[in-house]
Amino acid sequence: MNQEVLNIFNPVQAAPTFDQIRISLASPEKIRSWSFGEIKKPETINYRTFKPERDGLFCARIFGPTKDYECLCGKYKRMKYKGIICEKCGVEVTLARVRRERMGHIELASPVAHIWFLKSLPSRIAMMLDMPLKDIERVLYFEYYIVTEPGLTPLKQHQLLSEDDYMRAQEEYGDDSFTAEIGAEAIQNLLKAIDLEKEAERLREELSGTVSDMKQKKFSKRLKILEAFQESGNRPEWMVLTVVPVIPPELRPLVPLDGGRFATSDLNDLYRRVINRNNRLKRLIELRAPDIIIRNEKRMLQESVDALFDNGRRGRVITGANKRPLKSLADMLKGKQGRFRQNLLGKRVDYSGRSVIVVGPELKLHECGLPKKMALELFKPFIYARLDAKGLSGTVKQSKRMVEREQPQVWDILEEVIREHPVLLNRAPTLHRLGIQAFEPKLIEGKAIQLHPLVCAAFNADFDGDQMAVHVPLSLEAQLEARVLMMSTNNILSPANGRPIIVPSQDIVLGLYYLSVARDGEPGEGKIFADLGEIEAAMDAGVVSLHAKIKARHTEMTPEGVLLRKVIDTTPGRMKIAALLPHHPQIGHRLIEKALTKKEIGNLIDIVYRHCGQKATVIFADKVMGLGFKEAAKAGISFGKDDIIIPVRKTAIVEETRKLAEEYEQQYADGLITKGEKYNKVVDAWAKATDRVADEMMAELQMKHKDENGREKEINAIYMMAHSGARGSQAQMKQLGGMRGLMAKPSGEIIETPIVSNFKEGLTVQEYFNSTHGARKGLADTALKTANSGYLTRRLVDVAQDCIIVEEDCGTTKGITLRAVVEGGDVLVSLGSRVLGRFTAEDVKDPGTGELVVPADTYIDENIADAIEAAVVQSVKVRSVLTCEAKIGVCGACYGRDLARGTPVNIGEAVGVIAAQSIGEPGTQLTMRTFHIGGTAQVAEQSFFEASNEGTVRVIGPTVVGSDGALVIMSRNTSVSVLVDGKERETYKPPYGARLRVKDGDLVKRGQRLGDWDPYTTPIITEVAGKIRAEDLVDGLSIREEVDEATGIAQRVVADWRTSARGSDLRPAMGVLSEDGSYKRLSNGGEARYLLSAGAILSVADGDEVKPGEVIARIPTEGAKTRDITGGLPRVAELFEARRPKDCAVIAEMDGRVEFGKDYKNKRRIKITPDVDADGNQPEAVEFLIPKGKHIAVHDGDYITKGEYIIDGNPDPHDILRILGVEALANFLVDEIQEVYRLQGVPINDKHIETIVRQMLQKVEILEPGDTGLIKGDHLDKPEFDKEQEKAIARGGRPAVTQPVLLGITKASLQTKSFISAASFQETTRVLTEASVHGKTDTLEGLKENVIVGRLIPAGTGSYLRSLQRVAAKRDEQLAQQREDAMEPLPAEIALSDAE
């Protein structure tokens, strides 16, 4: 009874709970069943009375009353008449809220095609009827008749007839011998006539019978849509509307403005046009108007309904009175301002304030300063409640007055309310989850929020006028989550790479660095002190200085855990830092007996976190910050102009390089090198010179100068700032005191003349002009790429949002193999750091002894990682999200460590979103950082390799001895490795044509150069000696003399011979002949003929004698472009979108021998003949057609292995997947993407990239459907396919054959299982059209779709609730089953047996 009473006064029902959402086509019956009445008039409201017109668009009889519990005429008012329908005005007495829910409808006088299914490509109606879209449009818009029933006439089904044809046919065959119709009725009847089952059956037969690819594709597309209609229970004719639904009036409001005008939603205009035309059409039909008029009206009706659904999709856009296009139903949904992104995903939060931030150095790490005024406003409801509870005020009104007057007791209560009630601080843009953190508020005077200095790095905040928003978590659960998960003290490590993010910066670093400096000859050197107090007394007395080398007693913990005091060598400054270190066996004074740079302090915090846990780290960080600020202030470090040192040798180096550049100019003038080569060499020389000047400058800055008493002078202040990492970089110092160096043009090319001056000397006018390019380009790039980076993040989040940890362990034995990242002899990323925080997939054994280092399924922590490093293991197979076999989401063991916590990941962690944020966040950071070095070009070219270990050289692969006795590498797969104690420590694959400085079996020292090559050209080298013969080198066709204007020197360059008809069948080549005029034989049995590609520069002429290892021709490579993230962000996007690169590499599909076949038009034919396989069968050879003029990296007769490049370039990721498989693809993508970030010095953990790649590899393509009933060429999710496959195998059918497909992130997002998520991402119309035809069900598994329907997301706390719901549902099923079992009567079975 109570519930009933409550219902009367509070009619808000709990929203119905649901587990999934289905979208399908609405039948006319369905639309009528939703509707509360037909709308017959286009009127809206009476402009005098403001009452809705009857039967109009706002009719109260259909949609409900405008005021709560009051009919329109006012006969029935108040609650007691609830549910009565007024006999005068026909309005039901109920809540006005029903006007938001009740729909109406319009009965159309003539059917109308739904524009989404007609025009949204691929057109569903056209596919159902198997007709071109153009023809269907002609019929719909009354241009042509369509034959629906040919009868016995020679006309064909679906044939189009113009007006004249139709007349003629009627005369010829008689009126009744055939039927042809026109307009939407015709299309509707054709759709009605389709028998889905028969049609599908027929298509399947045709599919199995056809061989041509085109037809197969066409049939399978059509079959798919037929099956979709069959399975979803939709009828094709529903794509043509006979009834149009009208949405509730409150959702398309009409608002009176002052001055008797109205503001209205565009939908009302659109509906009005539909109703007007519909009514006119009805009247014309009743009046039996001429056909042509009716037809015109029908066409106009079709157009008006089109505009209502999707304005501008067909024909011209319908505009309103103010010439602005009207916003149709489709526009309401799509785009950034549409329903999905603006209102469902972009909800705003209440209880928030925002203000400027200032620094709060005396705060603790978990605190923030909140202005009193702001706190009072934010915590108002809490204050009212507390005032009431304490009996200080009787009513809310009274409380309100007290708070407004700011009476003294209010402040006391505010203190109580705020105590331990965390607030969230957010700084836009929130690029990763550390952009919102929780703090305990501390009331302060003033109007600015105080922020702790150490969290600035996470927020990317600075105090130059940044603003931050404050949000108050209201419910107890929210407060709990804020405290446990979001408190700044819980976010010490960065989720992107697991390194501390709460790291001192700027002043603090400078203070600590200054403290940790030790200097010779300081007062008090060599004294011994008992403790810190004694040192401080001595410093106050001036007996000892901060940097003196002294001895002192220091307490440390032994490995047994006992505190021990011992005398150590230190300085007073270092003692101060040592006093802050927590006691732990692993943490001793040795960690700080060095100059503490920013990096060292970061490592220190990391070590404290690993060994002593979170609490100790927070306390330590706070203390360190205090000390750093204090000491930086005391040190008073400053610098003047004279602190910028210009190196003595600068002029000498510049002159030397000038001479070198002139020499190159001369060589170019003499025709020894090309213009491009000269450019490359000059740029390179100047880049090297700039670096040398910078090194000289740094060396002079570091030199220790002593005064006459032997005391060291103060270190240079600028050097201190840069070296400690407090501010500035070596690149900036180089520009202050060295030389600015090379500049880039806006196009990205490097200007040949460098800027020789530095900022201290001042730039000349010309230099200044040159340097403005870089600066301007930097600023322009920043603006553009911020947007690009944001869009990349959005796509990444969208593709990865449903990747959640769902279980502890999926139990797979698969994994990926990780190796150290080595480049040019330097280990960039060690194996230990790559495998850290993962689970091993199989046993790791010592390569030398074969003994077990780590068993399988072990979590690799720091200690185990060190053990793996120590055992010199080359590679480790670890679990990875790429190989995880969890059905939805991924499992904890495959993911490994939660980087932000340093422990194995928890169930319910949204690892996909974290991955997307970690990759996207630096994108914005980096783009904003392009201009810091002022556009100074850095040429990143590597042209040699050195040994990084001492050992023996082993050269494997073809080489030849050149004229100077050096080995020249003759193949793409020659490898040079260094062995230590017989174990391979490092391996290099130098490029073709590199010259080795060592021979096989030589002993090398560490750092010794093993070989080098010219980075600017690729040579073509002869393997044998003999006489040169030029072939097909026809002057003016395939070769041209390039005479340089500047020098008048000619050189012979191979021209592009395909441009003219005469040269189409030339094959320019250089042959090496023996005495008798035949070709020399090469070691692999081929002829010594070297094909030349366009652009090659000849080094020898016809008839010259050559020796082995001599260069016949050079192919210039592109000039060095600046490697900025400018190349980086688009590169990352290109990789994630899996686009085919422009000039992509051609990859060998199998092992085999290369042959050059007969040429085809202007393509070269390359054939790979594989070896005979184990059964003695000869597999089929593979042919490639390659455009002439491309440089082919293999030679006739070479043996190549699968996956090798036949043509150099960027490989196509799809090829890698097809030829080498998933693991190779993952390695390629991870390495390429990491390279971009590494170049910028941004550390990101590999597993984030792997997570995104997993999402790109979710689909498989059906190659052979077998007996699964799937369609060839279909793309399916792996779990779905597995289900179908199991069914087929269980039936005893043939299994299907599939291959994995790689989808770019945009495509993968649009093809996700959830149509809600896809629709809110991009191409809303297309997604919804497809989903409704297929009758798709969204099971609400990802985060996005749950946010949109307003439920808890299935991650974090929500994932636990989700699992509880699952358990509950299972239990309910079991209980129901038990009940049924209990109810079953027994006698039925007995009766059965009698009957038998």
Curated annotation (Swiss-Prot):
GO terms for cellular component: DNA-directed RNA polymerase complex. Residues 1372-1396 are annotated as: Disordered. Mg(2+) binds at D462, D464, D466. Zn(2+) 1 binds at C71, C73, C86, C89. GO terms for biological process: DNA-templated transcription. InterPro entries: DNA-dir_RpoC_beta_prime (IPR045867), DNA-dir_RpoC_beta_prime_bact (IPR012754), RNA_pol_asu (IPR000722), RNA_pol_N (IPR006592), RNA_pol_Rpb1_1 (IPR007080), RNA_pol_Rpb1_3 (IPR007066), RNA_pol_Rpb1_3_sf (IPR042102), RNA_pol_Rpb1_4 (IPR007083). Gene3D superfamilies: 1.10.132.30, 1.10.150.390, 1.10.1790.20, 1.10.40.90, 2.40.40.20, 2.40.50.100, RNA polymerase II, clamp domain (4.10.860.120), RNA polymerase Rpb1, domain 3 (1.10.274.100). SUPFAM superfamilies: beta and beta-prime subunits of DNA dependent RNA-polymerase. Zn(2+) 2 binds at C810, C884, C891, C894. Residues 1372-1382 have a biased composition (Basic and acidic residues). One of its GO terms (molecular function) is zinc ion binding. Belongs to the RNA polymerase beta' chain family. DNA-dependent RNA polymerase catalyzes the transcription of DNA into RNA using the four ribonucleoside triphosphates as substrates. This is DNA-directed RNA polymerase subunit beta'. It comes from Caulobacter vibrioides (strain ATCC 19089 / CIP 103742 / CB 15). The gene is rpoC.
